[in-house]
Amino acid sequence: MISIKAALSLAAAIPALVPALVPASPRPVQGAEAPAGDTVTTERLVTEITGFLDAEVAAHLSAVPTLNPPPALVLGVPTKGDFTWGSFMRAITDVAALTGKRAIAGRDVPETLGRLGLIEARLGGKTFSQLGAALALREFGTDLEANPLWRSLTRPERREWRELLDPGRFYDRERKQVIDLPENYFGVAARIVTMDHQMGLVDRDFADELLERAAAQFRRGALYTDDSLPTGRFDRYSQEYARFVYEAAGNVGRRDVQEAVAPSLTAVMRTWWDLVSPDGYGYPWGRTIGAIGYMDTMDIVGFLAAHPRFRPAPLSDLAGAYWAAWQWLQGDYRRDRHLLDMFGFGRGNYHYMTPERQWQQTTSFMAKAAGSLRHLQAALRQEQVASFPARPPLPAVARFESFRKGDRPAGVWLVRQGALRFALPFTTGPKAGIADYLPAPHGLPGFAVPVEQFLPALVPYLELDDGRRIVAGDGADVIEPSADGRGLHAVWRLWTVVGGPPARPVDVGLTSTVDWAIDGGTLVRKETIEAARPVVVRRFEVALPTTAGDLVTHWDGSQRFDRLVGDEARSEVVVEGSSPLDVSAKATGDSAVGRGARGPVPLILMYSAENLTLVPREPFTWIVRYDVRWQARAGEAASTTFGNR
């Protein structure tokens, strides 16, 4: 049997021979779980995480020899990416608060934070850079006359800090819009301006005005915020946006705004709990996930510890998810380099997450870990939770959650049934047809899409005779979940053009009807494409990207069975079509289509057909069956293939 895994392991090892051979942390296995029955004490949780953060933030600060001028490199990676110094400020602030230390690596914390803020002020830092500065300043008191950070600044430096804390750097007060940014940045602006008001830097009218603008979608009754109004982009940012606006309203005592946001928080927290994986991973679709999906879990649990009314589960169970996420991030942390391995072999990132942001993402992880642990440890001790499960006891789930109703509804089908678990979203992405946002079973063991790539991942691309490629995505025309939640029916009469702007559906004379069903441990997808008038499909193609390293193909007569074997899952895939489908397999190496959010996508199975002529009453149908519980049958013959047969 040919092993793709072995070839990839060799390829991954070659660049590692160049630097000094220092042992790194064990790499996490996607979807790995702690043994059932294991428990963790609260004391261990607090001691382990606090000790790590204390040592690592000191190591990071020691790696910054001077702040004037700021170094171009820290720990061997660039510092010119977005939010660099603001994230570092937040990490130092939260770790100092967690440990109770006033000095780190021999440096006075308030004075160091004051210098870091001046770097961001002079670089024109915006959004999360400003948020980090506001949180750092407020940590030392809202009375600036007694605030040691503020007192460490000269009068001209205080003017620079005031400019840094002005949300007008990215919020247009006249138009009441964030400037060229997604909707969730209203939450960032609201947190900054309300902290500014707490510290006497802006008047109450401005704080209330911006807060009301940030709360607009919630005021209109939205449970899930559209991050790109009005296109219908729903992803991880819905929960972050809701948390941010709720916290901002709390800063200025706006209970009315908090109550407007409360229904959203109840909904998004339940959805997060229904989709979180056993290893603590959050939203499996959309942008800015990967390691951030685990940081989200820590952030969310910290929020829920402080706000018990929104908890979807007991605190001890939430702590189990927190611990699982922490363990994954520890496995991803390169202690020899003091960095998260976000650009390791087979790791994909959205285009804005450049190598210039590796250090920033690492310090952001430290900040989120320290900030969330402060809330979690307080709640665990107050509620006398001495220990909790190392693996979160996640409930069985089979339901559809609506994001938006109307002519083009959106939502997500959530399934957690034994080994079969996934989230299948109906939403738009930054570009039509991008794999991260397709209505595919994201999080399904053994299945993973490459990051920010155009790949027909279990959702076909159809190339028409005029050269356009279309896909059934960007919400749907009809979404009908079954009564028991174990099936779903969706219809697309309007399609989107792959690579084009989102939410611009086109009528090409075709209708796609898709039925998903759970059959034991098998997920079944059946699609029927019908024509209202003759339509030539120059090429039909659909892909199955997998985390498996080994492919074994078995034939039973004319029926092909593909077995996908990897660390995460052993799956069997059967694909059939009413017209013959060519099958090929591609080993991706370290190409763009081989980079997943959490690790490599070593292999892609491609199914295709050319020159299909669809006419009324003669539909094209294809079916895929994905069994996550496959075990080899005794005496069965097998062959391995990487090409067409």
PLM regions and their residue ranges:
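Low-complexity, Ser/Thr/Pro/Gly-enriched N-terminal "stalk/linker" regions
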Residues: 32-111
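Beta-strand-rich recognition/accessory modules
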Residues: 576-645
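Extended polysaccharide-engagement surfaces of secreted carbohydrate-active enzymes
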Residues: 278, 282-285, 292-597
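Aromatic-lined, polymer-binding surfaces characteristic
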Residues: 76-301
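Bacterial N-terminal signal peptides
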Residues: 7-23
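Signal peptide processing junction and immediate N-terminal pro/mature segment
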Residues: 19-33
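N-terminal secretory signal peptides that target proteins for export/translocation
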Residues: 1-4
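Extracytoplasmic/secreted proteins, especially bacterial periplasmic and envelope-associated proteins
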Residues: 44, 48, 52, 87, ...
